[in-house]
Amino acid sequence: MPFSLDLEKLIDRKCRVAPTIDPARTWLHVTDMQVTCTDPKASGYLKGGYGIPSGDECVVSCNRVIDRCRQEGIRVSWSMFGVEPDGSDAGLFLDKVRFWYPNGGSDAKWGDPESEIDPRMHRRPEEPVFKRPVPSAFFGTMLNRYLTSNRIEYLIVVGLSTSYCVRNTAIDASNYNFRPIVLADCTTAYDPYEKTAGYVEALRNVQGQYGDVMTSDELFKMFDEAKHTHAAA
């Protein structure tokens, strides 16, 4: 089921870090759009439902945002989550993954085909890809350096999963003094028992303390408004 939640009824969005946007100082980061989460046949597939998109549907919505951002001159980076095959860098992740996948599965291990970025994604070869074994795309990577070197102020975050890597990346973006924007229709979460609870709570946490939560259509409207403002100046 595609995204169909009413954010205004679920999240208090009055306080914003990005009431307007400057595309020239904006960056798009695509988090963990890997086969394990996006392929309906994969071990970690995110099924969605109850108004939130599936991993497969996020491929479509994320590509739509990627294409529009490129039209606005916004650069794109990517990240992938995974651990070494022997688990030597996994830390506490292995303790948690046993709960997620009680029947096993090697989807999060480098070298497994499921760990690769979904080939349907509109990724260009020259765009940076950051690999790490922890939730935040900033931790142990060069993402912060790319953003600061390009004088970025606004960081759009899309991808998987909402309550894990997207939320943690948005938090670290705020910690580094960027203005994070998470697109609710371009992410989804693991909620095997709680329906939309983890997804909504993660978005509330981002909006309440770190950044802004909106839909891709709302973002595109901001792009259009920025053009009108620039033309009138």
Language model features: what each stretch is:
Residues 1-27, 35-36, 64-72, 96-233:
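Active-site-adjacent betaalpha module
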